[in-house]
Amino acid sequence: SALYALYDFSPPARKMRAYTVRAYVHGSYSRRGPWYDFEPVPGASMDGL
């Protein structure tokens, strides 16, 4: 949860944030998280959380 909050403070870095969250939170066991699609797509956002 802390990781989500930390990266959510950088609106301009949405794409990078998507990459990071996917890699550190779900990259080890799934390409998609339980709350959001972590694929690093343009305009990606964690608002789905």
Swiss-Prot record:
The record's keywords, sorted A to Z, are: Antioxidant, Antiviral defense, Endonuclease, Glycoprotein, Hydrolase, Nuclease, Protein synthesis inhibitor, Secreted
Q: Describe the processing and modification events after translation.
A: Glycosylated.
Q: In which tissues is it expressed?
A: Milk.
Note the SS bond partners. Answer: none
A single MF term (Gene Ontology): antioxidant activity
Its family remark reads: Belongs to the pancreatic ribonuclease family.
Record's keyword annotation contains Secreted: yes
Instruction: Report the enzyme's class at the first EC level.
Output: hydrolase
Q: Where in the cell is it found?
A: Secreted
Return the GO cellular component terms, semicolon-separated. extracellular region
| BP terms from Gene Ontology | defense response to virus; negative regulation of translation
The Enzyme Commission number assigned here is 3.1.27.-
The answer on whether this UniProt entry bears the keyword Hydrolase reads: yes
What is this protein's record name? Glycolactin
Principal subcellular localisation of the protein: secreted
Q: What does this protein do?
A: Manifests poly C-specific RNase activity toward yeast tRNA, elicits a dose-dependent inhibition of cell-free translation, inhibits formation of superoxide ions in vitro and inhibits the hemagglutinating activities of soybean lectin and Ricinus communis agglutinin 120. Inhibits HIV-1 reverse transcriptase.
